[in-house]
Amino acid sequence: GMLLGDCSTVLGKNAVNYNLKCKHNPKQYDYLIWKYDILKENLGKNYWVSKTKSHFAGKALHPGNAGKEYVMYSVSLGTHTLVTHIRKIMYINNKKFVSPRLLKLLTPIGLAIWYMDDGCLSYRKNKDGTICSREITLNIQGFDNISQENIVKYFKDTFDIDGRLHKDRDNRRLWMNTTNSKKFLSIVK
């Protein structure tokens, strides 16, 4: 789930295996450390944290922030054969590709991490202020159309969750209505 969300793989100079790296803003520092404690427990590797300054590159999404400097926390696991193995499944020509094989590797905690990295729970209210629906959106705009279709099919075939691809600027996001959002949340609790 981490690689589907806010983590990436990095191959260091003269390295044989890939390193897993995540970046989050200071508000998500505790969440970042929690994710890496899971990895440390399961992979037996230590990690290190660094505080960096980055420049906002998302000109198309947030034009007012282009070029602004901001603080990020970066955590690196170090190289590991498992990271290299998953990268071979997930990347084609150095681009993330979400295959059915990759999706079968997801666990409920992996889904939860992906949701916490790239998901959103929205509420719609009636005129009187009462909540009438809860909807989940999973931001999958960074994946190609085939990957997006694979994700929709995975949720339907595995959990009987009917997700829909909704237009978002020049791409699509996965949207779940109230019924399907409840199913999803029951899996990732």
Residue ranges and their predicted role:
Residues 2-189:
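Internal intein/HINT superfamily modules and their associated LAGLIDADG
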